[in-house]
Amino acid sequence: TRVPQGGRIRLTIEDKDVDFRVSCLPLMGEEKVVMRVLDTTKGVLTLEQLGFAASSMDLVKKNIDKTVGIILVTGPTGSGKSTTLYSIMHMLNNEGVNIVTLEDPVEYFIHGINQSQIRPDIGFTFAAGLRSLLRQDPDIMMVGEIRDNETAELAIHAALTGHLVMSTLHTNDAIGAIPRLIDMKIEPFLLSSVMDLIVAQRLARRLCQYCKREKAMPEEVVTDVKAKLSKIKPEILARYLPDYGQKPMMFYEPVGCDRCNKTGYKGRVALIEALDVNDFIRESILKDN
């Protein structure tokens, strides 16, 4: 092929329905293909299984109980944002609750949730879909991604009219979602009134639990870690790192064994930053600070 292509393939392999998202890029004399493999039979994981700490899960539960407002999940492409939203929707998926989604594409089918896949090629964009969703009497709306000003404005409007809206953004950290939306021409006073929770995440390779090896941290890393931890209030540090300062800092390094195909890694783990938009942050947004 002479142009980039993308698509989706669904196969049944050993009685498992497996989805492949394929991206092809033409190079000089060859073609580069990247495939993302989605095992649809695994079902939706819980937040705990995804790697959320108890404190982060508490923030999510507190904010989804409000039934109105906006919850955003941010991070780069392939960081597991959609997987986190599926987990949250699964928590909210109860009889009598009308959950409607706009996705690109629908990655997992969840019984009881009304899932719709956008088609930009025929004009069915996130913005066009959101307008229709508002007439579908939804309780909860999930928009796969806020990509432009129009989608952002419609999501804000939906939250202001009594809906819980969940979506994703591409930002480097949680707090970065706020200036990103302001850059999309969202008025700060509107943003401060509807934004409730922002979750930023990354995916890291998980060390193989069978062959990982403990190793002392290099001195320069210890110095850097101590400098960063010194900025944290002592009571918070004691809560999350009760043994800090009582023994040498250690970490684990990959080794490789038959269970991990000699790579030293098996699976991935989510690194989560959950930002509860409290009154202080709301006031800062209003001051555009």
Q: What are these language model-derived features?
A:
Residues 1-289:
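Short, flexible helix-loop junctions that flank or precede catalytic/ligand sites
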